[in-house]
Amino acid sequence: MSLGFLNLTKLSIGANEIMSTRCPELKSIRKVSDRHLRARLAGLACALFLASLTIHSQNISWPQFRGPDSNPVGTHARLAERWSKTENVEWAQEIPGRGWSSPIVTGGKIYVTTATTEGKSKPPQIGTEYSNEYVAELQKQGLSMDKILERLTERDIELPKEVKLHYALYCLNLKSGKVEWQKEFFTGQPPGGRHRKNSFTSESPVTDGKFIYVYVANLGLWAYDLKGKQVWSTPLEANPIYLDFGTGSSPALIGNLLIIVNDNEKQQYLAAFDKQTGKQVWRTNRDIGEKGQRRSGWATPFVWRHALRTEVVTVGPSEAISYDLGGRELWRMSGMSATTIPMPFAYDGLLYIDGGRGSSMFAVRPGAAGDISLGKDESSNKYVVWSQPRAGTYLPTPVAYEGGVYTLTETGILARFDAKTGKLTYKTRIDPAATAFTTSPWAYNGKLFCLSEEGQTFVIAAGETFKLLHINELDEMAQATPAIVGERLLVRTETKLYSIRNKK
């Protein structure tokens, strides 16, 4: 900022010299003009200073799932590229219970949710192939599909009647990792079951810098101030989720509105709540997905701000739909899979939609209206800039970085597409050891980071050629997407929260 101020000072001096040399007749009013010019320049300097503070505050804040703009890219040059359980670990704090929600950060404090269980709980299971192999084994035994589902439920699903939970919000000091306070916001049976890979607190909280907003789908919304005082709570109706897989769509904030999307087997809706009171402002029912098929969704809504307007983009079973801030539909697009988990996001003027496993990846330009679905033989149209068939992923949300969009499958296949054209630049398995991923990849300092469920982070050079640089080990299951705050990387594993910071 000091350099900018010096430049402004030079500009002021230069203006005085011009006035003296070329406009001698203005000497009589020179002092007045000089004062006005200096005042305007001082005002500009102040504005630039405030802007720099805003940028700085963004660097030390991570207000929601996947960060300020929902595309997790760090900007600090000192962010660590290597770590282990001991190397470049500033601190590691145990978090009781289990939760795959991401940590959020504001005002030098970290906020994270968790749920502890009275009695035994089914442990998480790494990967997805164990279910596929089990189903294949049961099919060989000649079991009917109903019997197979019954066996799967018995093995993999934790039902509400089996557990009593204590849901809690934790506040930790960013610098030390010390727990400053914890608040239990609900005790009792959950509204639905969960798959053993999921948790009962997979929705990440969100903050506006003044309050922390906690959401558990089909259970409720809660608001806390930064000191841990509950400001309001709003109970929500319980609705069934497909096969009791559990929930995971995080809330979004825009202005005074706290927005949630809830696609379940009974009803599907988008709703906005007054963030100051918790009262519902509007609710829009969504009738998406094929009749008689699965109706549940897990994708977090995305607030897309662009030059034409601000809109709320949602992805659900079979369709992506965008709404204005009053809940009115703006446009929709078919072609999504029946199981939708990745979150939409924007990069360099375009919206990117991952349609889910087996579906396409889409790039959409601003200003869309009506049904913008692609025709049978189309790969683009007036609003869809490009699409890539079968480029959609199951669990991780893609990341856009340095001109590329990177997609990561749950089995460890990484692909890079040109962000503007959609051209595939490479597609490869990261490593023979990289076989299970839920966490979304992130990027900084010319590198891409992919955290596996086994706790290994594969560090890859960004660019058009794939190059695995090294592997960082934490040796504990991980499914939560990290937070990037200044020069710190916050990584949540099954039992701990790590602050990774370069010590060199």
Region spans (language model):
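Bacterial N-terminal signal peptides
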Residues: 42-54
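Generic hydrophobic-segment detector
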Residues: 32-37, 47, 167, 268
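Prokaryotic Sec-type signal peptides and long signal-anchor helices
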Residues: 4-12, 53-57, 421
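N-terminal secretory signal peptides that target proteins for export/translocation
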Residues: 1-39
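N-terminal export/targeting leaders of redox proteins
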Residues: 18-20, 45, 57
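Noncatalytic, solvent-exposed loop/strand surfaces
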Residues: 55-504
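N-terminal hydrophobic alpha-helix used for membrane targeting or insertion
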Residues: 5-6, 45-47, 162
